[in-house]
Amino acid sequence: NSSSLARDNYREFLDLVSGDPVLRAEAMRRLGDLELEATEAAQLGENIDALATDSYDSAVGLYQQLLEAYPDYRRNDTVLYQLARAYEIGGLTDDALTTLDELVARFPDTPFIDEVQFRRGEMLFLRKRYNDAELAYVAVIDFGDESKFYEQSLYKLGWSRFKLAWHEDSLEPFFDLLDRKIGDFDLKEGEARLAGLSRAEQELVEDTFRFLSISFSYMGGAEGIDRFLATRGNPVYSYIIYRNLGDLYLSKERFVDAAETYEAFVKHDPLHPKAPLLQVEVIEAYEQGGFPTLVLDGKKAFVERYGMDGEFWVRNPVDENQAVAAHLKANLSDLAEYYHAKAQTGGDRQDYREAAGWYRKFLAYFPDEPDSANTNFLLAEILFESEDFFAATDEYERTAYAYPMHEKSAEAGYAALLAYQEHEQTLQGAEKTAWHQQYLDSGLRFADTYPEHPESGAVLTTVAEELFADNQFDLAIAVGQAVVGKQPPVEPTLMRTAWTVIAHSQFDLANFVEAEQAYYSLQNYTPPDDPEARTEIRERIASSIYKQGEAARAAGDLETAVGHFTRLGTVVPD
């Protein structure tokens, strides 16, 4: 093949230039390179005996002879480099390291000094000679970031210093590496930008973060991070460092340490877009550890820091932080439900106030959410249970009438009436009168809005009675008519009450014709076994007919008057 032919040609050429040291040295180097390439090609072809071939021995021998015979050859740095490679290929790593050491000592300015130092660093690191490895990696970094070994050397420099227990000194190269790889990340790009790195770059970044977690765990945990960042500044990825350390503690079931680490970042940079999500991690760590009181405190801290009226939302638009808003809702609901249940169990007034406060915050922050109506109902319930009937009335009515129809709408409207009645018992005089009128208005609104509610007829009937008692006869009649006109019909006892209101109101308004007809209807709903009531109705009918006769006589219509008086004896013979 062409490689074999080229090697044969160089061997012949060596014989021809035996008297010319320059050409002979160049030919020896080139032949050595070809022999080494042939060895590598055989290895790639999975020839396990490749190192036992003449090519390998020839390459090593040529490089050694060249270095010995021509110590001043201008490319001896390359020869040493190739000889070190040959030793490494042959598994003679001690010889390879010795050769690289010689190269560094003799040719410190060789163009590939960065690669040489990196390879030395790798060999020294494997031999646990961390001091020497550290110096080798520093040399690569001093070469400059144009070296393709620069980033890997930053990584291994950090590890070398860590192995030497130089924990704080080990951090700088790791942070320098992260600054290069993700220091310009826009948080909005987040994971998508990280996913855009090559597989090798992703692994390098992930390994670096893992190391930092281990290193900071040796440096006092979150306090160590705080101290370091106080001198270096706060990189865009700092939240990942706190989060990863917290995750490390969590994996070891060090729940309090995990929570305190997450919270350290929140305290360090509370307005950072990721801070609320780490506050969530605080809560979850305490939950996993079984610390209910600390869970409660964590939820309160979340709401206090990230309520919708806080500075966080000035800097971080809601539409870009929907997850934070969702956690805020969940924590508000959890706090309200916790204190509501606690109040119902223990009856402590402070727990009632606490529950109401969290419900009110939820409604203030999320007034138009689908579950806001139900939350408003729960607020009204806690107020009623705590006997704050005045406030309960307002919240029940808001629940019933201020939202689109929902499953608690009608129940809230009816509950408002109960709250009205309870609060009225605490009032007197004009204040009580005004409140009672509001109660009647609310009753009418309830019956009109929720005619299908099982209590709608009873509410209307009660309102009709109350209006009659207040001498509001026209309105009492209208409400009574609404009761008797309901479909399906209300129960007979309510019909009886409604017709009583209608008939008496018409009579008191001197509408005796209408009163008479209403009393006939009332008679239909008065049971036969209530003779006293039936007697009263007959007397009312008689009075209505008599009053019609009197009215006709006063108007000069004697014929009509006589008809009424005559009819009186027929309709009410006794």
Feature map (PLM): residue ranges:
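Acidic, polar-rich low-complexity tracts and alpha-helical solenoid repeat scaffolds
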Residues: 1-574
